[in-house]
C-alpha cells in the first residue's frame, strides 16, 4: 500500500498529497472532489456537465453496440477515475469516453473493435464534437489507452451496485409485484447514478442500499420484513453496517439533483410565445390606411386577398363610401374580376353600374365603339346573369384584322339565326 502511495505521489504531483490516503484507493470526500485537476480553468457547473456528457456518451455508444450493462458501468467508472488526475482541457471528454469504453470491453470480455466504436461515435456527435478525435481517430484512442492504464494504475476490476441490488432484493418479503417494481426503479437509479460522482464517494453496496431506499419511498413500499437478521432495527443493517439514514438521504439527493439539472435547460414557454407573434407581420405589409380601420372582421378575410393583391387595391377604390358593407360586397365582386380582368367589365354587371356612374369618362369611350359593332349582330342584348363572362371580346377588333373577325361575326350570326329558327319551331 505504501508503494502504491509513493508511485501516485511521483506520478501525479501535489494533487495526491491533498487527498486522504487512509481511505481506499478510489474513494474521496466531497471536499476533495471540489478541488480536482478536472476543474482547472473550469467552473464546477461546467466540470459536472462535462462528466455527465461523457458518461451519457459512453452509455449511448455502448447501447448501440449491444454491450452489457457491466461493460458500460466499468467504462464510466474508468472515465470518472481518469479525470480525478487530468484536466478536461488537456484530454477531450469524447475521446476519453471512447477509450474507456474500448478498454472496458476488453476487461469485461465483451470486446469491440476500435473502428466500430469510432464509427458509432461519429453517428452520435456533430462535426464540432467529433473534431476532438483529430485527423487519425484510431491513433488518438490507442495512444490515450496507455495513459488511461497508467492513470488507473492497472486496477481494472470494478464492482457495481447491480449485483448487490439483485442479491438484496431476494432477501425482502412482501408482494412480489411491489418488490419487482421496487427493483426496477432502483435499477434505473443505478444507471442514472453513473452520471454523478457517487462511484468516487461510496462503495457499491452502500449505493445499492440507497437506491432501494429511494425506490421504496417513491413506490410507497414500506420494507418491514426480511428473511435474515430479524433483530436489526433497520432493514439495510443486514447488508451494510453503520450506515445512518442521513447518509442514504444524501445519496438520494445527489441522484435527484441530476434530474433537476436536466430539466432546467429545457424551457418550452418562450418558444410558444414567439410562435404567436408571427401572424401579425404578414398582415402588416399589405395593410394600408383603409385596411387598419376594421380590426375585428378582416383577420379571416385578410388571408384570401394575399393571393391577388392587385384585386384588393381595386376594391378599395370602388367602395370607399360604405365601409360597413365592404366585407359583404367583396365576396361577390371578386369572382368576376378574377375571371375577366378587362377594364370595361362594369358594363356587363348590373349591380355595379351605380359605381361607374360616378365616373362617366372611362365607360363613355368604350360604350359607343362596342355598341356600333354589336348592334347589327346582336341587337338589344338581354342582361346576362350575374358573374357570367360575356360571349364576345370586350373591345372592338382592329380594322387591319377586319377580314378574319368579320368572318367570325358572320358565323356567329348564322348560328344565332339557326337557334332562333329552332326556338320558333
UniProtKB/Swiss-Prot annotation:
Keywords: Cell cycle, Cell division, Cyclin, Mitosis, Nucleus, Transcription, Transcription regulation. GO terms for cellular component: cyclin/CDK positive transcription elongation factor complex; nucleus. Coiled coil: none annotated. InterPro entries: Cyclin-like_dom, Cyclin-like_sf, Cyclin/Ssn8, Cyclin_C-dom, Cyclin_N. GO terms for biological process: cell division; central nervous system development; positive regulation of DNA-templated transcription, elongation; positive regulation of transcription by RNA polymerase II. Residues 366-377 have a biased composition (Low complexity). Disruption phenotype: Morpholino knockdown of the protein causes unconsumed yolk sac, small eyes, deformed head, reduced lower jaw size and curly spinal cord at low morpholino doses. High morpholino doses lead to embryonic lethality. Residues 379-399 have a biased composition (Pro residues). It is found in: Nucleus. GO terms for molecular function: cyclin-dependent protein serine/threonine kinase activator activity. Residues 262-425 are annotated as: Disordered. It comes from the Eukaryota. Belongs to the cyclin family. This is Cyclin-K. It comes from Danio rerio (Zebrafish).
Amino acid at each position: 500500500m505504501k508503494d502504491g502511495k509513493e508511485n501516485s505521489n511521483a506520478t501525479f504531483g501535489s494533487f495526491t498529497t491533498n487527498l486522504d490516503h487512509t481511505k481506499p484507493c478510489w474513494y474521496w470526500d466531497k471536499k476533495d472532489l471540489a478541488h480536482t485537476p478536472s476543474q482547472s480553468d473550469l467552473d464546477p457547473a461546467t466540470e459536472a456537465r462535462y462528466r455527465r456528457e461523457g458518461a451519457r456518451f459512453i452509455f449511448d455508444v455502448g447501447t448501440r453496440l449491444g454491450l452489457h450493462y457491466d461493460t458500460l458501468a466499468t467504462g464510466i467508472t474508468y472515465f470518472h477515475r481518469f479525470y480525478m488526475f487530468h484536466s478536461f482541457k488537456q484530454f477531450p471528454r469524447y475521446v476519453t469516453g471512447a477509450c474507456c469504453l474500448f478498454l472496458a470491453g476488453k476487461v469485461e470480455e465483451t470486446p469491440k473493435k476500435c473502428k466500430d466504436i469510432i464509427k458509432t461515435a461519429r453517428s452520435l456527435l456533430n462535426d464540432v464534437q467529433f473534431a476532438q478525435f483529430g485527423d487519425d481517430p484510431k491513433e488518438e484512442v490507442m495512444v490515450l489507452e496507455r495513459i488511461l492504464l497508467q492513470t488507473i494504475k492497472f486496477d481494472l476490476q470494478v464492482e457495481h451496485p447491480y449485483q448487490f441490488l439483485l442479491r438484496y432484493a431476494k432477501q425482502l418479503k412482501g408482494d412480489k409485484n411491489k418488490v419487482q417494481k421496487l427493483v426496477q426503479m432502483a435499477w434505473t437509479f443505478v444507471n442514472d447514478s453513473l452520471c454523478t460522482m457517487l462511484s468516487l464517494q461510496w462503495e457499491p453496496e452502500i449505493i445499492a442500499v440507497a437506491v432501494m431506499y429511494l425506490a421504496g419511498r417513491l413506490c410507497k413500499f414500506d420494507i418491514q420484513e426480511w428473511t435474515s437478521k430479524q433483530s436489526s432495527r433497520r432493514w439495510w443493517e443486514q447488508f451494510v453496517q453503520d450506515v445512518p439514514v442521513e447518509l442514504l438521504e444524501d445519496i438520494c439527493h445527489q441522484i435527484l439533483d441530476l434530474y433537476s439539472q436536466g430539466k432546467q435547460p429545457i424551457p418550452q414557454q418562450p418558444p410558444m410565445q414567439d410562435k404567436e407573434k408571427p401572424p401579425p407581420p404578414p398582415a402588416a405589409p399589405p395593410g394600408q390606411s383603409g385596411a387598419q380601420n376594421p380590426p375585428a372582421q378582416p383577420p379571416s378575410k385578410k388571408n384570401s386577398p394575399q393571393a391577388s393583391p392587385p384585386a384588393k387595391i381595386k376594391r378599395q377604390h370602388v367602395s370607399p363610401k360604405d365601409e360597413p358593407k365592404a366585407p359583404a360586397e367583396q365576396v361577390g365582386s371578386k369572382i368576376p374580376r378574377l375571371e375577366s380582368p378587362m377594364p370595361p367589365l362594369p358594363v356587363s354587371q348590373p349591380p355595379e353600374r351605380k359605381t361607374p356612374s360616378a365616373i362617366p369618362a372611362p365607360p363613355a369611350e368604350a360604350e359607343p365603339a362596342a355598341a356600333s359593332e354589336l348592334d347589327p349582330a346582336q341587337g338589344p342584348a338581354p342582361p346576362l346573369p350575374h358573374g357570367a363572362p360575356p360571349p364576345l371580346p370586350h373591345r372592338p377588333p382592329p380594322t387591319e384584322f377586319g377580314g378574319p373577325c368579320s368572318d367570325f361575326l358572320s358565323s356567329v350570326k348564322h348560328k344565332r339565326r339557326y337557334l332562333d329558327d329552332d326556338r320558333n319551331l
